[in-house]
Amino acid sequence: LLSRGLGDVYKRQHMDYGCLIKFVTFYYQKHGCKSLKKASELGDGARHIRNACAHNSVLLLNVFEKNDKLSNVNAVITTFAKQVDVIKYKNYKKVNDLISLLVLAKAYCSPAVLQYHKQAINNSIVRCQRNQSAYAKNVELTKMMVVFKKIVDIL
């Protein structure tokens, strides 16, 4: 429990994810710290996934909307998309955001944390495939699951 005096210190020093990314970007631009380059470039995309999860938004719907495409994609995203054979989907915002999140995880998480998250993701995929026949005729969901599995496999 926080004492009365420490509660104020906690409130003054707490930073949400959006502010953290802004600070990392500011710090990277000012000092050129190479270890923060990926966080600066890809943090905003990962923020979209974080916010969707925090607010219980559905990620797998409306992924391939024509009006939901990015005109410009970071070179790191393009390289990763080529590696996992999803290059033609890299400009879709949700695919781009998911790739951003996983590239950041590979760059900044320990092997043990990566393994833990990979197992959790694989468990989710197994749960999704349990009722695969229910959505087998939904082309968008089926395509997203294929793309999602390819992206996650690189962890």
Indicate residue ranges for each PLM-predicted region.
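Polyanionic, low-complexity intrinsically disordered segments
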Residues: 19-44, 48, 58-155
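Flexible, active-site-adjacent loop/turn segments at secondary-structure boundaries
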Residues: 10, 57-58
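Single conserved hydrophobic/aromatic residue that forms the stacking wall/gate
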Residues: 1-10
